[in-house]
């Protein structure tokens, strides 16, 4: 069976069809004597054994996805090992389907056991796709935003297809404003702002106090090294803390679409225009792979290894 001549074109076609790795596609065609449909089934049947082998590999690529359903929105992150797989329609459909289920599931544990259209749970569907695609895949995280009234704005940066991309943001504005279109437009603009400016909290009080104290200590030590008197140091530190807040607190940041105003001032102006109070209930910002250790790869060596196999 190993003597069968498998063309590069056939391997390429099978890879495009299934998203599986090149060597897996070649092996599938050899094992099935070049029968294309049987090769697809062969890849699917590899299942759990393949998934177990792939599970130890770093999955830091992939996609973030958003789904908004009325006054509920979710963001999920589904990881793959390579950007090539993230551009595959099969993987994109998987991420989109998981996001759709997340709106109903509301938490990641329930989401993992939720049933997909195939009848498999999300976890089982991911394992099946590991077998077919040939890379480690993972549902890494999800978050949900729910409001009682108002509008949810969403934005996806570096969008590859609608609602899927590298950075996904949701912003929930609570308000009883009658003009929903203007409220939704404001929520959308703030979502774009959050994507670009990466705030750490909505206001001062919700900012991690450990982070504030760490910054305060750094500023104090730096000012002390400059040989300033203690009373001057205290004023300098407070000034730097205020600047720090303006950089990381959403309401204090200069608004992306009108830097002369802070986000708080933009909201205040909108309240006057719409005749109703507007409050940012929550924002979610997912950036693909943040916090994951990336494995450095040499592409030339990787291709050479495949060629030698």
Curated annotation (Swiss-Prot):
Its main location: cytoplasm. It is found in: Cytoplasm. It holds the Pfam family EF_TS. Transmembrane segments: none annotated. Residues 82-85 are annotated as: Involved in Mg(2+) ion dislocation from EF-Tu. The keyword Protein biosynthesis applies. GO terms for cellular component: cytoplasm. Associates with the EF-Tu.GDP complex and induces the exchange of GDP to GTP. It remains bound to the aminoacyl-tRNA.EF-Tu.GTP complex up to the GTP hydrolysis stage on the ribosome. HAMAP family: EF_Ts. This is Elongation factor Ts.
């Amino acid at each position: 069976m190993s003597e069968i001549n498998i063309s590069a074109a056939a391997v390429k076609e099978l890879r495009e069809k299934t998203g599986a790795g090149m060597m897996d596609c070649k092996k599938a065609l050899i094992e099935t004597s070049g029968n294309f449909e049987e090769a697809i089934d062969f890849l699917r049947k590899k299942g759990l054994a393949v998934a177990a082998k792939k599970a130890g590999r770093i999955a830091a690529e992939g996609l973030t996805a958003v789904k908004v359903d009325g006054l509920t929105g979710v963001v999920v992150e589904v990881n793959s090992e390579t950007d090539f797989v993230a551009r595959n329609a099969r993987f994109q459909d998987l991420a989109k389907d998981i996001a759709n289920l997340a709106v109903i599931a509301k938490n990641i544990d329930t989401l993992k056991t939720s049933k997909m259209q195939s009848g498999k749970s999300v976890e089982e569907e991911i394992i099946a796709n590991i077998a077919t695609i040939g890379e480690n895949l993972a549902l890494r995280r999800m978050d949900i935003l729910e409001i009682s009234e108002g509008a949810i704005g969403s934005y996806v940066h570096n969008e590859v297809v609608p609602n899927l991309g590298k950075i996904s943001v949701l912003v929930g504005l609570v308000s009883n404003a009658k003009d929903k279109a203007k409220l939704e437009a404001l929520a959308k603009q703030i979502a774009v702002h959050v994507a670009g400016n990466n705030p750490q909290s909505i206001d001062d009080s919700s900012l991690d106090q450990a982070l504030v104290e760490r910054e305060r200590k750094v500023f104090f030590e730096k000012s002390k090294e400059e040989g300033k008197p203690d009373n001057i140091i205290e004023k300098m530190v407070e000034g730097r803390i205020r600047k720090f807040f303006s950089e990381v607190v959403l309401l204090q940041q200069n608004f992306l679409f009108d830097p002369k105003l802070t986000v708080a001032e933009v909201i205040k102006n909108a309240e006057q225009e719409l005749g109703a109070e507007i409050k940012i209930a929550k924002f979610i910002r997912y950036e693909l792979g943040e916090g994951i250790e990336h494995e450095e790869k040499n592409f030339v060596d990787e291709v050479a290894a495949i060629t030698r196999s």
